Swiss-Prot record:
Cross-referenced Gene3D superfamilies: Ribonuclease Z/Hydroxyacylglutathione hydrolase-like
Family statement: Belongs to the PqqB family.
SUPFAM superfamilies: Metallo-hydrolase/oxidoreductase
Keyword Transport in annotation: yes
Species whose genome carries this gene: Methylorubrum extorquens (strain CM4 / NCIMB 13688)
Highest classification ranks of the organism: Bacteria, Pseudomonadati, Pseudomonadota, Alphaproteobacteria, Hyphomicrobiales
Role of this protein: May be involved in the transport of PQQ or its precursor to the periplasm.
Keyword terms: PQQ biosynthesis, Transport
Name listed for the protein in its UniProt record: Coenzyme PQQ synthesis protein B
Pathway in which this enzyme or protein is active: Cofactor biosynthesis; pyrroloquinoline quinone biosynthesis
CDD domains named among the record's database cross-references: PQQB-like_MBL-fold (cd16274)
One of the GO biological process terms: pyrroloquinoline quinone biosynthetic process
Gene name of this polypeptide: pqqB
A Pfam family this chain is assigned to: Lactamase_B_2
Length: 299
């Protein structure tokens, strides 16, 4: 199984377009300690030829250009991207669908709840139904979006997308609007969970034994954005678990047998983005890799 992390940042990327927090300031200055990062997306293939795109970032054209595996190679119109799978309806995971509208056939997979957030917005009708086949997938159903690649979706604690929030919103609910994925090929297993509000016993059981885990790395501490002075929301309010602390992802997953552990979907205010920081060193010392754009895994 071949895995390419196309975009490793959370919504807005690094640096964010209007941000001069301490981390974005380093990125704007071209400081080598903070790599620029695009918004959350990965691609997975069983053979290096046919690819499944997981989440369609607003930066998808830039990501395709930066990764030769994604380039068109045959005739006048071609793409090695055969299918797209959405793990939620967040803007940073669906806006890139509008870029993939140039008459290129592919299948779009999501749970009924996630797919409804796309289908109910007419702007996405630029993806003609006869060209882009929308496929509804139930939780715990195993399917093959690309031949040789088996995928199972499962609910994880989360919330509805920001643009669908209302008074009835429940943070941490396990529904079909935020899902994790288990991907299998060639006897190897990859768990991809870019958004998660908490680690449950069921989640730990599902990912146990995976050869690699790509997990929500939005915030180091729950109050990262508040400490940075650029926002008032906590990680929890945004539907994301913190890395640190007794209930954080590092401690909660420490006893789960997993191969490689990689943080993705990293917010611009997370200090682990600074490569020589004590925060980065602490995370790495506990067995985790901080993803960057273009990072590849061959399982």
């Amino acid at each position: 199984m071949h895995v390419v992390i196309l975009g490793s940042a959370a919504g807005g990327g690094v640096p964010q377009w209007n941000c001069r927090c301490s981390i974005c300031s380093l990125a704007w200055a071209g400081d080598s300690r903070v790599r620029p990062r695009t918004q959350s997306s990965i691609a997975v293939s069983p053979d290096g030829e046919r690819w499944l795109l997981l989440n369609a970032s607003p930066d998808i054209r830039q990501q395709i250009q930066a990764n030769p595996q994604m380039h068109p190679r045959e005739g006048l119109r071609h793409s090695p991207i055969h299918a797209v799978l959405l793990t939620n309806g967040d803007v940073d995971h669906v806006a890139g669908l509008l870029t993939l509208r140039e008459g290129q056939p592919f299948s779009l997979y999501a749970t009924p709840g996630i797919l409804a957030s796309v289908s109910d917005n007419r702007v996405f009708d630029v993806m003609a139904a006869e060209v882009v086949k929308r496929q509804t997938i139930a939780l715990n159903e195993t399917f093959e979006p690309v031949p040789g690649l088996s995928v199972t979706l499962f609910s994880v604690p989360g919330k509805v997308p920001l643009w669908l929030e209302d008074a009835s919103m429940e943070i941490g609910a396990e529904t079909e609007t935020t899902v994790g994925t288990m991907i299998e090929a060639g006897g190897k297993r990859l768990a991809y969970i870019p958004g998660c509000a908490g680690v449950t016993e069921d989640l730990k059981a599902r990912i146990a034994g995976a050869d690699a885990l790509l997990f929500d790395g939005t915030v180091l501490e729950d109050d990262d954005m508040i400490r940075a002075g650029v926002g008032t929301k906590t990680g929890w309010r945004m539907g994301h678990i913190q890395m640190n602390g007794e209930t954080g992802s590092i401690a909660s997953l420490a006893d789960v047998e997993i191969g490689r552990r990689v943080f993705v979907h990293i917010n611009n205010t997370n200090p682990v983005l600074i490569e020589d920081s004590s925060e980065r060193a602490s995370v790495e010392a506990r067995g985790w890799t901080v993803a960057h754009d273009g990072l590849t895994l061959d399982l």
